[in-house]
């Protein structure tokens, strides 16, 4: 027991040292904010954040043996950076709402709890908030591994001049939530149609006699569950904390390989980090081999394409544009050359942005 006492004393000493260093970091962040403000420099620099994350993860693994989990380290440093940044300026983030949805969760994972968040009713509203500078950033869903692409997000890039400034990939884990503490009390289950579709087998097997009801969002389902102990909601863990609901069953989604990718949008371009993606859209003539000739450019320059998606151009029937994600930054020599050649082989080319790849997804 004496050894346990000594170890706890050592933990107390370390905690005090961590607290001292956090306050030192906060003081430095405030000084940096003052310098940036005088020089009229952007307060938030995502490229610098990426540099910090990569350095911390590398040190943890290579120098300290990786005893502390990498994913937990990302979450901790996200909040440290978010809190320090708020001492310089509170970042304003618009996202597809309502609160406690997966888009809200993605935004929190990217910007931390110290940012100021504005839920929007539609994807268009998120774009408008950023375009009009009422928000510094926006967060919108773009694709799900099971449900596919979010077409409305892609369509918005056809008409908007905002840039892609980041991506977030999160696992979609669904739980059965309720104000009751027993699953036996649940008579009705509410959720968004997509969430219900993704856990249909579990519901049929475990709650075969329960009425399943679609509502406009997982957040709405939680609001209903909060008011009625006989109601259950299918939603995220963030929703459980937000609405103070009990988690009656965890991970009830039918597929374990369910991820959603979100895009961060902004008004400015980002500098290279050394681990970037570039998103573009282009149109080609309606003739044989036109798309092949366009895509051949990337093969020629040894550039890997991670995604290609077609959408109607909305200008005339059977006229399509192509959305492409590729590895590398637009300022890299090979990417710059490829995009220059692509412009000559297409009817139009629009670079949507170059941005750091999602952390821990490489």
Curated annotation (Swiss-Prot):
SMART domains assigned: CM_2 (SM00830)
UniProt GO BP: chorismate metabolic process; L-phenylalanine biosynthetic process
Pathway(s) the chain acts in: Amino-acid biosynthesis; L-phenylalanine biosynthesis; phenylpyruvate from prephenate: step 1/1; Metabolic intermediate biosynthesis; prephenate biosynthesis; prephenate from chorismate: step 1/1
Keyword Oxidoreductase: no
CDD domains named in the record: ACT_CM-PDT, PBP2_PDT_1
Pfam families, per the entry: ACT, CM_2, PDT
Annotated Chorismate mutase domain residues: 1-92
Sites annotated Essential for prephenate dehydratase activity: 260
Aminoacyl-tRNA synthetase in keyword set: no
Keywords, alphabetical: Amino-acid biosynthesis, Aromatic amino acid biosynthesis, Cytoplasm, Isomerase, Lyase, Multifunctional enzyme, Phenylalanine biosynthesis
Organism of origin: Aquifex aeolicus (strain VF5)
Location of this chain's protein in the cell: Cytoplasm
Function: Catalyzes the Claisen rearrangement of chorismate to prephenate and the decarboxylation/dehydration of prephenate to phenylpyruvate.
Main subcellular location: cytoplasm
Domain ACT: 279-356
Protein name stated in the entry: Bifunctional chorismate mutase/prephenate dehydratase
MF-aspect GO terms: chorismate mutase activity; prephenate dehydratase activity
EC number: 5.4.99.5, 4.2.1.51
Reactions the enzyme catalyzes: chorismate = prephenate; prephenate + H(+) = 3-phenylpyruvate + CO2 + H2O
Residue ranges of domain Prephenate dehydratase in the record: 93-267
Binding-site residues, substrate: 8, 25, 36, 49
């Amino acid at each position: 027991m004496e050894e346990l006492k000594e170890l706890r004393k050592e933990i107390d000493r370390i905690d005090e040292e961590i607290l001292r260093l956090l306050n030192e970091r906060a003081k430095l962040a405030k000084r940096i904010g003052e310098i940036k403000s005088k020089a009229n420099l952007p307060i938030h620099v995502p490229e610098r954040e990426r540099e910090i994350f990569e350095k911390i993860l590398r040190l943890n693994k290579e120098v300290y043996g990786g005893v502390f989990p990498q994913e937990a380290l990302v979450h901790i440093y996200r909040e440290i950076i978010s809190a320090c940044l708020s001492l310089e300026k509170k970042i304003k983030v618009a996202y597809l709402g309502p609160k406690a949805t997966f888009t809200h969760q993605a935004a929190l994972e990217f910007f931390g709890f110290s940012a100021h968040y504005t839920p929007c009713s539609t994807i268009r509203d998120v774009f408008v908030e950023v375009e009009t500078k009422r928000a510094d950033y926006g967060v919108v869903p773009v694709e799900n591994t099971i449900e596919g692409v979010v077409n409305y997000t892609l369509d918005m890039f056809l008409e908007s001049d905002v840039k892609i400034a980041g991506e977030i990939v999160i696992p979609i884990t669904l739980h059965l939530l309720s104000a009751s503490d027993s699953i036996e009390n649940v008579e009705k289950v509410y959720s968004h149609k997509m969430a219900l579709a993704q856990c249909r087998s579990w519901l049929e097997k475990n709650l075969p006699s329960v009425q399943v009801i679609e509502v406009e969002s997982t957040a709405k389902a939680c609001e209903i569950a909060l008011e009625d102990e006989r109601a259950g909601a299918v939603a995220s863990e963030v929703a459980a904390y937000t609405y103070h609901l009990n988690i009656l069953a965890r991970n009830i989604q039918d597929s374990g390989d369910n991820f959603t990718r979100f895009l961060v949008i902004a008004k400015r371009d980002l500098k290279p980090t050394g681990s970037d993606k570039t998103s573009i859209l282009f149109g080609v003539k309606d003739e044989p081999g036109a798309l092949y000739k366009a895509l051949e450019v990337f093969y020629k320059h040894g550039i890997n394409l991670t995604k290609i998606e077609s959408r109607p151009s909305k200008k005339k029937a059977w006229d399509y544009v192509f959305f492409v994600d590729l590895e590398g930054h637009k300022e890299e020599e090979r990417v710059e050359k490829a995009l220059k050649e692509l412009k000559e082989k297409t009817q139009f080319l629009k670079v949507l942005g170059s941005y750091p790849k999602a952390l821990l997804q490489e």
